[in-house]
Regions:
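Conserved alpha/beta-hydrolase
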Residues: 1-12
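Alpha/beta-hydrolase active-site loop
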Residues: 17-36
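C-terminal alpha-helix
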Residues: 33, 198-206
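Active-site acidic short loop of glycosyltransferases
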Residues: 39-41, 134-135
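Short beta-strand immediately N-terminal to the catalytic nucleophile in serine-hydrolase-like folds
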Residues: 45-47, 71
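Gly/Ala-rich beta-loop-alpha elbow adjacent to hydrolase catalytic centers
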Residues: 47-51, 55
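Active-site signature of alpha/beta-hydrolase-fold catalytic machinery across serine-
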Residues: 57-61
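The alpha/beta-hydrolase serine catalytic core
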Residues: 64-166, 171-200
Length: 208
């Protein structure tokens, strides 16, 4: 089951509803619906970027998850999880956070972002949550992330490698960008195929 977070994709909610608490509630509702409708047993979360951060946090907050697949998660501790807003100057991210928390919201990247998101990001540490939940976890990053710092990637890789059933897969995605795409069509197709096959194989192993 796939879901769009508030203000994203097919969601009809305003982007100001894009907060970690709302996203957590949305995931819980989706899992409940899936289990009631399809009678599923074990449940895994697959998340990309901010979705990967939320997937990392969710088991600690709500439980009931068997495995995680994290595609390029934005797992920097606290506000470092928002580093993509200005990857070259983190002080600018801190200034945006202060403004948003003081005024209730700010406009950036063409959307209105709630101060609540910055506060909840500041108070969250997804890699600490991964260590605590210690679930089977697949982690992938590409060779050209761009909007995620080398530090965030290295710290997250180290955490997943330390887990009893952690698996880090990097090589098939060396030519991809943060969205696992490439301007070269053949490379893009290979990235898509590798991501799907790697994820499916991992989930089959731990959900069967």
């Amino acid at each position: 089951m796939r879901l769009d977070f508030p203000g994203c994709g097919n969601s009809t909610e305003p982007f100001t509803a894009y907060t970690l608490s709302n996203m957590t509630d949305d995931v819980e509702s989706a899992i409940t619906y899936m289990q009631q409708t399809y009678g599923t047993g074990r449940t895994a979360l697959v998340g990309h970027s901010m979705g990967g951060r939320l997937a990392s946090l969710y088991p600690q907050r709500r439980g009931g998850i068997t495995a995680l697949a994290l595609w390029s998660p934005a797992n920097g501790a606290g506000l470092r999880g928002m580093e993509f807003l200005n990857i070259d100057d983190f002080s600018a991210v801190e200034a945006l956070a202060a403004e948003a928390e003081a005024s209730g919201s700010i406009s950036t990247w063409g959307v209105d972002v709630s101060g609540t998101l910055f506060t909840e990001m500041r108070d969250s540490d997804p890699n600490a949550a991964l260590r605590e939940s210690a679930l089977p976890t697949l982690l992938t990053y590409t060779g050209h992330e761009g909007i995620l710092s080398d530090t965030t990637q290295a710290e997250t890789i180290a955490v997943v490698e330390s887990l009893p059933d952690g698996r880090v897969v990097l090589e098939p995605f060396a030519e991809g960008n943060h969205n696992y795409l490439s301007e070269d069509a053949a490379t893009a197709a290979a990235l898509d195929k590798a991501l799907r096959e790697t994820t499916v194989a991992f989930l089959v192993e731990y959900l069967k």
